[in-house]
């Protein structure tokens, strides 16, 4: 059984609307999601002793989510990740997007899907959010109807994304939750054991745009096919952290993507997805200045993201899996976050 409760989370400034919070609860998980950015604000998971802790980074109040912050828990779009120089050409026409990450456009632009109010609909086992992204929003062509559905099933949180376009446009939707399986507010993720089911990754240039090469993980820091303890692994390979797309094996059906185990608590997160890639990000840009839930500071490497996605900058790299959605087609992807103890 899943219970769904609805409450006011806060009011937007200047009478711009009321943000609601939806609490989904099963016998194993409790998830809070708000209608601002379809944002996961809390996710309580039991450890091997049966004690529940909140394992996602975020804020207690709406104000936290309205300030400049690194997409904690939000759905990002119209195109997640980076588009080089914020431009792409479609049917001979060049489109210019908002530049908001060095020379590039990141996560949909200045006012992406994470910074808008969505319309909620309560389901028996979850909540569905919808919105219409108008033609030209953040520079993207065509109107885009979008639905994001969160449902609970025991220890599994399922996120389904659907979209329909009035004209051809790139679409790439993901959730940007930062996890710490020791509990949010824990100082780092070095004691997490990580596995990612990928034989290849995308090397990036100095502004984190893929170079176009699809590189084998063999013999590199990116070989996470067997479990590695993150802290030791980063030290051993002298890397500052990960912020890279891993190219997932398998077909467009549900595929295993990643597993993270925190030995101290016993908590395990397994991720499955229909998407062709996952951005593994280790919170390299967190610096402890934002005050999170219960006053927690979030320093570098205090959370990790597994952003299931199409490959970054695919709209400019024709040999990457396609990201264009045409009128009459439906974008439809699902990601499963499965929690357990071991």
Swiss-Prot record:
Beta-D-galactose binds at residues 81-82, 107, 176-178, 243, 279, 307. GO terms for biological process: galactose catabolic process via UDP-galactose, Leloir pathway; glucose metabolic process. Its EC number is 5.1.3.3. It is an enzyme of class 5 (isomerase). One of its GO terms (molecular function) is carbohydrate binding. SUPFAM superfamilies: Galactose mutarotase-like. It comes from the Eukaryota. PROSITE patterns: ALDOSE_1_EPIMERASE. It catalyses: alpha-D-galactose = beta-D-galactose; alpha-D-glucose = beta-D-glucose. It is found in: Cytoplasm. Mutarotase that catalyzes the interconversion of beta-D-galactose and alpha-D-galactose during galactose metabolism. Beta-D-galactose is metabolized in the liver into glucose 1-phosphate, the primary metabolic fuel, by the action of four enzymes that constitute the Leloir pathway: GALM, GALK1 (galactokinase), GALT (galactose-1-phosphate uridylyltransferase) and GALE (UDP-galactose-4'-epimerase). Involved in the maintenance of the equilibrium between the beta- and alpha-anomers of galactose, therefore ensuring a sufficient supply of the alpha-anomer for GALK1. Monomer. This is Galactose mutarotase. It comes from Bos taurus. The lineage of its organism: Eukaryota, Metazoa, Chordata, Craniata, Vertebrata.
